Amino acid sequence: MALPAPRMLDPRSVPALRWGIIGPGSIADTFVGAIHRHTTQRAVATASRTAGQADAFAKTHGLERVHESYEALVADPEVDAIYVATHISDHLTYARMAVDAGKHVLVEKPLSYSASDAEEFFAHATAAGVLAMEAMWTRYLPVSDVYRQLVEAGEIGTPEFFQANFANDNRHIERLWTPASGGIVHDMGIYPIAFAQFVMGNPSAIHATGRVTAEGMDAESYVTLEYDYGSRSLLYISGTATVPCTATISTSTNMVTFDHPFFVPTGLSVSNKDLYFTGEHWADTTAVQGHDGLSYQASYFAQYVSEGRTDSPLHSHADTVGNLRVAEAICEQIGAYPSGQ
């Protein structure tokens, strides 16, 4: 089987939006660096609640303006779109602020702790006529399009079983273990949850066991998802153990394996189902590697703005809400309450 080349958007073909950055921390640093290296998108302004942080960020990335407040940032007439990269607990507060100022908004994943809050926010943004998009960047990567083409061409059969791991010993990253961060399921686990949805759709049943910390934060989860059509997914999510972060699909005719780590620009193999997994491998050999892959979503975002869209066809509002319902169910079943409830 010859594996297809990805159908990717030329970043030079879309409008160069002027971006305002809310939450100029580490993930925003990665995002802005990536879009400046690989796209025509430009961050032009920022603000921060932490003294000096916005000034340092602006100096690093060559931003034109630093505002004294987030309210002033979203009101800036020379900003077209807002990128929200604060703690999860603040995502919707600032996303709503951007929408109410008439700005399109890209919000870091996960959008919220709460599926119902996300649903309400998306309805508000749609009514306002602006694009609101969760930054589930994996959906926009070349490897994801290679998989889409295989599905569209009927090359790999019907998915029967999906397995994915995101397990990395992150006990040293303090923010992952606080309610403001959302916990391991919401911060790390949202990747395998969303990838399962990408491949299998939304589940009809969710079964989870796991471990929580003395403070009630989730540390490790073992998740089985069942689907109305009889297939199932198995997810392992951990902030204490380290295993390869791969994703594998067993179909009626083949096995598809996404390389480690499956959520960045990487490769995939399509194999037969014998013991030795004979088949073909596709590798992403572009210059956009690692977390520079965050840049792809920005180009698609700009394209959707130019088309007048209020939702992303590759990762819809309904997709975000469905994934948050799974994350909520996992936390409830293992006794973790990352929102502090």
Task: Put a short name on every predicted segment.
Residues 67, 107-108, 132-134, 163, ...:
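Hydrophobic residues in well-ordered beta-strands that form the structural core
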Residues 138-209, 214:
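Predominantly a Rossmann-like dinucleotide-binding segment in NAD(P)-dependent oxidoreductases
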